[in-house]
Every structure is written in structure tokens, then in C-alpha cells.
Amino acid sequence: TGYFYEAVDGSKREFWESEKIDARAVEGTDKSIYQQIINEYGEDSDEARVEVYGDFPKSGQDQFIAPHLVDDAVARPLYKDPTAPVVVGVDPARGGMDSTVIVVRQGRDIVAIRRFKGEDTMAVVGHVIDAIDEYKPTLTVIDEGGLGYGILDRLTEQRYKVKGVNFGSKSKTPLMWGNKRAEMWGAMRDWLKTASIPLDRGLKNDLIGPTKKPDSKGTIFLEGKKEMKARGLASPDAADALAVTFAFPVA
């Protein structure tokens, strides 16, 4: 990740002329050494990609979502399946530099991403209602942490079909995922393998930002927002808004 990756393979590649050089094509190198790397680690391993092909690794060692998954999803055309259910996901801001983000997903497409800063509870309620009225979702899901509970309560009172999700609650598969947030991100990662998403740098940075944190039993947790901010990364608001669209099954 970072600017160098963006300049070669990412969102800034159109501004730079770059070339990847296979080490085996360089005069004077010992080809047998590079073949040994391929034989030992596999031809599609990160070791071979970096040491032999002059390419980027598929992901950082602890990165939960690899950049190539996101880039591939950006490159795919929209499916535009009108029969697929529409789900609206809402990640309310917790103050500071965070944004409230509303994501509208229909099947394998992201239909819309809307961001709002500095909005109070009732203003966010209004934005969610606007999205519901426009896209007619089967379900709207809200992260009920922070401002979320008040937003959820107000929308429920007005008889909108909404559900809240607690990121720290128990996963349906607790041996695999440490909490509901990790479970939703796991479902989102699987979805990205065939999805179509817009070219949105903020969304990409959010998706590839968090690291995975397995415990001693191998159960996966995700890096928290405070830990990400300590590393100089923004809160992954757009990715969390997309993730909540996978919280509950929809017909």
C-alpha cells in the first residue's frame, strides 16, 4: 500500500510511466536462484511476486483485505441486476474527523456512497430517510454504536424497516470470527471477489486499512479504529458502512 503502490498499480497509475522487470530477464543474474524461490514458495506466492517478478505482494502479512481484491472489483463493470435486493448500510460518525457514511448495495454492485460530516442525530436520520425513499431497500442496517442507537430508535419509531448491529456482539461462527464486525468484514471480503465497486479512493483506503488480529486459538479479530488512528490511518467509515449490509440475510 502507500503512494508507490498507487503510482504503479493503483489509482495514480495513469499519471506515471512504470515498468515491472522480472529478475530472470536481467543480464548476469543466476536464474537458478529465482527458480528455486518459485519451486519453494509457489509461482503465485508473495515471495515469488516480489523477489522474482518485480511485482507487489498480494497483501501485507497481516492485511485483512488485499489491494488486488479491491482493484479487481473496481475494474469490473456494474452487474445492474434489478432483481437483487437493495440493502442500505449506515455507519454513524463518532465525532472528530470521522464521517457518517451511507452505502447502498444491490447484489454485487455498490449503487451509492454518501458522506456527511458534523451532522447531529436528526440530520443523519433525515439523510437515511432520503436514501430509503430513493432506493426502496429491502433492509436498512445501522451500526448502533455511538450516535447509531438514537438514529435507529428514531427510524424505528417512524416505522421504517431498520435493524441495528453491535460490532462487538457475538459472531454466528465464534471459532472463526471473534465478533460480529470481523464476521461482516469476512463476508464483505468474500463478496469483493466477484463484486463491482466504484473508483473511490476513500473506500479503497478504508477496505485495505485494517489488519487482522488472530488470538491464540486462531480466531480472527480486526484492528480497532483507535489502533488504526494510532498508525496514522483514518477510521474506515465507508468500509464499515458497506460491511453492515452483510450483517443479516436478505431474500
Predicted regions and their residues:
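Conserved hydrophobic/aromatic positions in well-ordered beta-strands
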Residues: 103-105, 242
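Acidic two-metal-ion nuclease catalytic site recognized across multiple nuclease folds
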Residues: 114-115, 204, 208-251
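ATPase catalytic-site recognition across NTP-hydrolyzing enzymes
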Residues: 24-90, 104, 214-217
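ATP-hydrolysis module of ASCE/P-loop NTPase motor domains
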Residues: 1-7, 19-21, 39-60, 145, ...
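Conserved beta-strand scaffold positions in the cores of enzyme catalytic domains, especially
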Residues: 18-20, 87-89, 113, 162-164
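ASCE P-loop NTPase helicase motor core
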Residues: 1-44, 109, 130-133, 149-161, ...
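Short, flexible loop/turn motifs enriched in small residues
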Residues: 83, 94-101
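Mg2+-dependent endonuclease catalytic cores in nucleic-acid-processing enzymes, primarily RNase H-like
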Residues: 3, 106-220
